[in-house]
Amino acid sequence: MTKETQSFEEMMQELEQIVQKLDNETVSLEESLDLYQRGMKLSAACDTTLKNAEKKVNDLIKEEAEDVKNDESTDE
């Protein structure tokens, strides 16, 4: 599954698996580097997903506050 089609939860699960593999002392240096690189890409993708979600939540809160303010001004 590519990172473009993975959900946030799937990316986090893959990150956890990568950490477990990296903790295994039998992993070769080359494989460790590959795992680290993949982990960094997943971490960046998760960060972007979280920032986008945070922006959406903040936008919704702002929109709701504006609606409440408009409702209050029409009541007066």
From Swiss-Prot:
GO terms for biological process: DNA catabolic process. GO terms for cellular component: cytosol; exodeoxyribonuclease VII complex. Gene3D superfamilies: Exonuclease VII, small subunit (1.10.287.1040). Its main location: cytoplasm. It is found in: Cytoplasm. SUPFAM superfamilies: XseB-like. InterPro entries: Exonuc_VII_S (IPR003761), Exonuc_VII_ssu_sf (IPR037004). Keywords: Cytoplasm, Exonuclease, Hydrolase, Nuclease. Its EC number is 3.1.11.6. It comes from the Bacteria. One of its GO terms (molecular function) is exodeoxyribonuclease VII activity. It is an enzyme of class 3 (hydrolase). PANTHER family: EXODEOXYRIBONUCLEASE 7 SMALL SUBUNIT. Bidirectionally degrades single-stranded DNA into large acid-insoluble oligonucleotides, which are then degraded further into small acid-soluble oligonucleotides. Heterooligomer composed of large and small subunits. Belongs to the XseB family. This is Exodeoxyribonuclease 7 small subunit. It comes from Staphylococcus aureus (strain NCTC 8325 / PS 47). The lineage of its organism: Bacteria, Bacillati, Bacillota, Bacilli, Bacillales. The gene is xseB.
